């Protein structure tokens, strides 16, 4: 989304703009400089980066608002524990090299997915076909390591693909050093009705990848053997 345009329109009517910047981290996008009033991050994800912390931060541009948020956080007990804070700060030290590895692997996987006959559509802002590509190029310094794609296969083929993966773990989280795959329709967005999922563009064949920092060749090989097994499952169904 165009943060600058949204912020300008919001400020005209006296509204404040809060941006969740979790998927990109402060290294790839700085919403406050684009006009946002508050930026939030799930520190559980890229900032910590090792999937061993649950936490979050809210950063306000206005010092008075920031002071008010601190006051309420203390009153309500919303502050992190000492050890969680230590782990988060320790992870933050390696954010830059981790993000480089995340993005390099993502680029490699995107190139691979575009050659796969079982892949019907790919969603990632680095692709010119993505509706937000130009906005992302303008306001980000990188495109991130979250991507999704739709398989052109049956439910049995999809299940076979997921079961065949060994490096990608089936899980809902994201932003850690390990690679994860999720099936939004039955996991993150399961509470939505089928009609609501369809309206949101969440098909039964949609998969989401959080690309980790393992060796890129190994990740591609893992996906390749998953597609191979899914193809065999498809062929077996056709024989029946």
Where are these regions (language model features)?
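Conserved PLP-enzyme active-site core in the AAT-like
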Residues: 1-118, 123
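Active-site beta-loop-alpha junctions enriched in small/polar residues
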Residues: 22-24, 127, 152, 212-214
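FAD-binding core of FAD-dependent oxidoreductases
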Residues: 46-48, 52, 173-181
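Short, flexible turn/loop "capping" segments at secondary-structure junctions
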Residues: 49-50, 80-82, 139-142, 199-204
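Short, solvent-exposed beta-strand edge segments and adjacent coil->beta transition regions
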Residues: 53-55, 142-146, 204-208
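Short, well-ordered beta-strand elements within core beta-sheets of diverse protein domains
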Residues: 88-97, 144-152, 208-212
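Conserved small-domain helix->loop->beta segment predominantly found in fold-type I
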Residues: 107-175, 179, 192-198
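PLP-dependent enzyme catalytic core of the Aspartate aminotransferase-like
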Residues: 156, 163, 179-240
């Amino acid at each position: 989304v165009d943060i600058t345009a949204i912020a300008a329109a919001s400020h005209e009517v006296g509204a404040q703009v809060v941006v969740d910047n979790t998927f990109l981290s402060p290294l790839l996008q700085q919403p406050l400089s684009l006009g946002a009033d508050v930026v939030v991050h799930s520190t559980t994800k890229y900032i910590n980066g090792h999937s061993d912390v649950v936490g979050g931060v809210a950063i306000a541009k206005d010092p008075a608002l920031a002071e008010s948020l601190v006051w309420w956080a203390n009153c309500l007990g919303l502050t992190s524990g000492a050890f969680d804070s230590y782990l988060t700060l320790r992870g933050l030290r390696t954010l830059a090299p981790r993000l480089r590895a995340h993005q390099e692997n993502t680029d490699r996987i995107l190139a691979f997915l575009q050659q796969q006959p079982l892949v019907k559509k790919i969603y990632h802002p680095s692709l010119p076909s993505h509706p937000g590509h130009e906005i992302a190029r303008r306001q980000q310094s990188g495109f991130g390591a979250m991507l999704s794609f739709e398989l052109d296969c049956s439910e049995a083929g999809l299940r076979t693909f997921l079961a065949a993966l060994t490096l990608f773990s089936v899980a809902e989280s994201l932003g850690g050093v390990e690679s994860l795959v999720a099936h939004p329709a039955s996991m993150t967005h399961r509470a939505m009705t089928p009609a609501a999922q369809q309206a949101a563009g969440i098909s039964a064949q949609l998969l989401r990848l959080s690309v980790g920092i393992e060796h890129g060749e190994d990740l591609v090989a893992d996906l390749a053997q998953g597609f191979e097994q899914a193809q065999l499952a498809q062929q077996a169904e056709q024989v029946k």
